[in-house]
C-alpha cells in the first residue's frame, strides 16, 4: 500500500461508445486521469504516460494488466528508463487488480450518465475529483494536490483559499477492509 500520493498508480484501457480510453489512477488519493486515445499501441500509451508524468511527476510503481501494450519490450524499456517499478496483475486472474477495475467502472458510469444527460463528461470527472471521499476525508483532488479545485459550483473565496489537508491528522484509508492504520511520515505534506 502506498504511504503518500502519487507513489503507486494503476493504469488500464477501456472502451466507451466505440472510443478507447486510458485511465490512470493514484492508489492513495483515488485521483483519476482520463485520456481519449487515437491508438492503443505501446508507443501511444507511453506518450500519454510521459505527458501525465511531466505534469504530475513520476510514480515509484505502476500497476497494469498483461495487455500487449504493457508487455512489450518498448514499455519495459520506458519503465526502466523512467525508474518506474512495473507491476502486472496475474494473467490467470485479471481481477487481482481490483482497484483499477472498480475505478474503470466508476469512470464508465460517469461517462454514461454524462452522455445520457447531454452533459460535458469532463465536468463530471471534475465533480468526482472534487467530491470528498467520505464525510471525514477530503476529495481526491485535495489529497493529491493539497488544495481545493475551483468548480462550476458557487463558492466563497475563503473556501478557495482553504488550508491544505494534513495527511497526519486523518485516518485516511484507501481500502477500509485491508488497511485501518493512519498515514504518517508523508514527505509531501507541509
Predicted regions and their residues:
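Retroviral integrase
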Residues: 1-109, 134-144, 148-190
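Short, charged, surface-exposed loops that flank catalytic or proteolytic processing sites
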Residues: 113-123
